Design a protein with these regions (language model features):
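Active-site pocket scaffolds in enzymes
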Residues: 69-91, 138, 167-388
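Fungal secretory targeting signals
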Residues: 392-393
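Predominantly extracellular/luminal regions of secreted and cell-surface proteins
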Residues: 1-12, 158-183
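Histidine- and aromatic-rich segments of cupredoxin/plastocyanin-like copper-binding domains
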Residues: 2-157
């Protein structure tokens, strides 16, 4: 788990209160420890990365200690939504805030040596992160000289994802920008409750979204809730990297918009309906309104009786209620341990979103029926039947 923090002189963490730009941090942490080391055996290791920093993005690479100009190869095997279709060899890896990746690194060639995991300045030019004297360092691996037997290998194929042909038309365009010092999406902030739903997507359809970073010298990792998407394209006045091979080999829910970059993502909006968020995952930008919502709309004549339908954000069962601040401080009343356990048990008994297979099958049947209806009504007025269930995993 990667993070970066500022400390005050007394050793306490510096607060983000009042910060409206970014909180980069000058102390790099891995699993809560500043610049740690790990003793490893000379064999294959599977390493999982989560960027949990408030704002800092990482451009990671491995080198032998003291030899900075010779990056070492590794295999990327998974991203936000799980395994890739196949391992992708790389010598560096961009990990923006909230992104997750898994790699396999082979330490067998470096018995008795030390390997450093390092970070390119300004995320190799993709980001605008402030750099400090040691933010180019992440951690060290100390490789044992004792021989071990390791018969593990990375399969050539990891899983099957049936990617179909690209859509040719963009369904929605979203511009991430700053206006009068405020972070916005298409001119709207999340506090604008009447206007913050920027897209209505029919349940079970596939859409192509264009995400544009037009905020000048900033970058934005964009997180879309509910869905796993495919990164289709990346372009822009300062973009030269395109879609990274390890991005396109799997599905994701966070994509990084570097300076002046635009990215196309394609997602299947299913199986649930309801209102979901999408936002910048730089937590300072997110907390200062760079967030909006999309509504996966109900299907007419769907015909499936969902017992765990949580699409209504105004459902009185989950609405905020007045409380006694004295009970909150004393942890009594509704804040007592017994009351909290009772509430958690009540939520568990609701079994939210437990009908995944049933709802998915019902959506399959719904769209097959509608596709047949359209075929039987050639020449008659009929709405377009969306492409459904693009991603079979």
């Amino acid at each position: 788990v990667l993070s970066s923090k500022y400390y005050n002189q007394d050793g306490t963490l510096q607060s983000s209160l009042g910060e409206t730009n970014s909180l980069w941090g000058d102390i790099i942490h891995v699993n809560g420890q500043p610049w740690p080391f790990l003793n490893v055996e000379p064999r294959l290791y599977r390493l999982r990365f989560l960027n949990a920093a408030v704002s800092r993005n990482f451009a990671l690479y491995f080198v032998k200690s003291g030899i900075l100009d010779a990056r070492l190869p590794f295999q990327v095997i998974a991203s936000d939504a799980g395994l890739l279709t196949n391992p992708v060899q790389s010598s560096d890896m961009y990990v923006a805030t909230a992104e997750r990746y898994e790699i396999v690194f082979d330490f067998s060639q470096y018995a008795g040596q030390t390997i450093d995991l390092r970070n390119f300045a300004k995320a190799n030019g993709i980001g605008v992160d402030d750099d400090y004297i040691h933010t180019d360092k992440v951690m060290r691996f100390v490789v044992s000289s004792d021989p071990v037997t390791d018969d593990s290998r990375v399969p050539d194929q990891l899983r099957q994802i049936d990617f179909l042909e690209d859509k040719t038309s963009i369904d929605h365009h979203f511009r991430f920008h700053r206006t009068n010092g405020e972070w916005r999406i298409n001119g709207i902030g999340f506090a604008d409750a009447e206007n913050r739903i920027l897209a209505k997507v029919p349940r079970g359809t596939v859409e192509l979204w264009e995400l544009e970073n037009s905020s000048g010298g900033w970058s934005h990792p964009i997180h879309v809730h509910l869905v796993d998407f495919r990164v289709v394209a990346r372009y822009g006045s300062e973009s030269t990297r395109g879609v990274m091979p390890y991005e396109s080999a799997g599905l994701k829910d966070v994509v990084w918009l570097g300076r002046h970059e635009t990215v196309l993502v394609e997602a299947h909006y299913a199986p649930w309906d309801g209102v979901y968020m999408f936002h910048c995952h730089n937590l300072i930008h997110e907390d200062h309104d760079m967030m909006a919502a999309f509504d996966v709309t109900k299907l007419d004549n769907f015909g499936y009786n969902e017992t765990t339908d949580f699409h209504d954000p105004e459902d009185i069962r989950w609405s905020a209620r007045p409380f006694d601040s004295a009970e909150f401080s004393a942890k009594t009343g509704i804040f007592s341990e017994e009351s909290i356990r009772e509430k958690v048990n009540t939520l568990a008994l609701e079994q939210p979103y437990s009908e995944l297979k049933e709802v998915t099958a019902a959506l399959d049947t719904y769209y097959k029926t509608n596709a047949k209806r359209e075929a039987d009504c050639v020449g008659e007025a009929a709405g377009p039947i969306p492409r459904y269930r693009r991603f079979q995993v």
